[in-house]
């Protein structure tokens, strides 16, 4: 079997201030609870998208600047997933199931399909 090369960390340093990572994690949690809960509005979703853009930049700095830890990887994946949820919710101009949008209280037949998003 081929040998897997050792992971090169480059100039990454061990996280010296874990509080920054935990604060970002808490901000993500609060953003999703406050702006992307079951009852939504376009205004709240746009606010969430803005906050997630900032978090994405911070997490990118953590990802490339620190030695990777499970917390950094999980935070990166959670921010990516949260961004997809917000983007999808902004595209769907309807209320369906347990997700109610005050701006669009009715179902729309054109959204009676899966929403597929890709981000790289």
Regions picked out by a protein language model, each given a short descriptive name:
Residues 1-120:
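Glycine- and aromatic-enriched mobile tails/lids
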